[in-house]
């Protein structure tokens, strides 16, 4: 009987731990005009999303000090690493910070990845990926270096290509290299690992009049990547982020002329089905990166926000009382 009780106790404890470790889908976000800071939305099923109230990191670096296109990855030690667009133009880098709990953040850094290209117009939409094989981060972004490539459908100041750096600690940074030149202006790239030697890059064809999403394939995150596919979204879509739900990949994107989100599902990045009518995202949120986090971590975010609001209310009430 004692042995049975011990076994039941172990079983119950194991189940309690499993419940406590339940993961949710979370996405970084921001609100226009992008000067407030980092926000989050959360989902239990990957389709229907709710806002997590609060602004969790106020942008302090870059010429314009904005926080757009926030991209996040969790490294094996549990640390969350965040990169973002910190300037619209006339700047040479992106913002970076890290956190263990999404509440308390390191000092923000400005990483000047295009400092050796003084004519660079911008550094847009950095996306961070962790290469488990090499134990290093890969950050890809879009920059326009005027007259570096044939203009095609875009003028010299809007002719972007994709670049990347690698780093193990965001202190020592590799030399900036060209990641992808598909023969047209492209931005907003995100890398998806399907297996150890099978990678997909989803990105925006930023040339007129298309402004839509395409994919390319590679055996390594740093490329080389294949010729761009045909587009799989309508025009005026950007900011893709990809999450696996069951045996399918969901590709979320910003339909910026409609002020809404769309979504596509696929199993192979060749055949696509539009599921925009099956998703829901609170109004006002803009594109970020989907990741997974424990239910307890997200609850801690909510509790922290509520405690902060209560403190503000109590402080305000005390101030009013003193005025009477």
How should these model regions be labeled?
Residues 1-4, 319:
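Generic short N-terminal amphipathic or hydrophobic helices
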Residues 19-324:
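Carbohydrate-active catalytic/glycan-binding domains of CAZyme proteins
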Residues 4-16:
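Sec-dependent N-terminal signal peptides
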């Amino acid at each position: 009987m004692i042995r049975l009780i011990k076994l039941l106790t172990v079983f119950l404890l194991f189940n309690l731990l499993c419940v406590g470790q339940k993961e949710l889908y979370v996405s970084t976000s921001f609100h226009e005009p992008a000067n407030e800071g980092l926000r989050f939305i959360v989902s239990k099923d990957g389709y229907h999303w709710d806002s997590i109230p609060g602004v969790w990191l106020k942008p302090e670096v870059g010429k314009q000090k904005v926080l757009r296109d926030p991209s996040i990855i969790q490294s094996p030690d549990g640390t969350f690493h965040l990169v973002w667009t910190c300037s619209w133009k006339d700047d040479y880098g992106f913002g970076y910070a890290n956190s263990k709990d999404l509440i308390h953040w390191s000092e923000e850094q400005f990483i000047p990845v295009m400092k050796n290209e003084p004519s660079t117009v911008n550094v847009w939409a950095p996306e961070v990926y962790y290469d488990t094989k090499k134990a290093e981060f890969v950050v890809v972004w879009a920059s326009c270096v005027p007259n570096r490539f044939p203009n095609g459908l875009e003028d010299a100041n809007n002719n972007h290509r994709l670049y990347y750096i690698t780093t193990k600690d965001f202190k020592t940074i590799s030399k900036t290299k060209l990641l992808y030149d598909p023969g047209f202006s492209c931005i907003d790239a995100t890398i998806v690992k399907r297996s150890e030697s099978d990678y997909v890059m989803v990105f925006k064809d930023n040339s007129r009049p298309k402004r839509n999403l395409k994919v390319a394939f590679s055996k390594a995150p740093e490329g080389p990547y294949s010729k761009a596919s045909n587009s799989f979204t309508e025009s005026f879509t950007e900011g893709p982020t990809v999450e696996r739900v069951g045996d399918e990949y969901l590709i979320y994107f910003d339909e910026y002329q409609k002020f809404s989100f769309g979504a596509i599902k696929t199993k192979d990045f060749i055949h696509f089905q539009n599921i925009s009518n099956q998703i829901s995202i609170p109004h006002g949120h803009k594109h970020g990166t989907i990741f997974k986090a424990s239910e307890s971590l997200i609850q801690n975010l909510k509790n922290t926000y509520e405690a902060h609001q209560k403190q503000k209310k109590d402080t305000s009430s005390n101030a009013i009382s003193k005025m009477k």
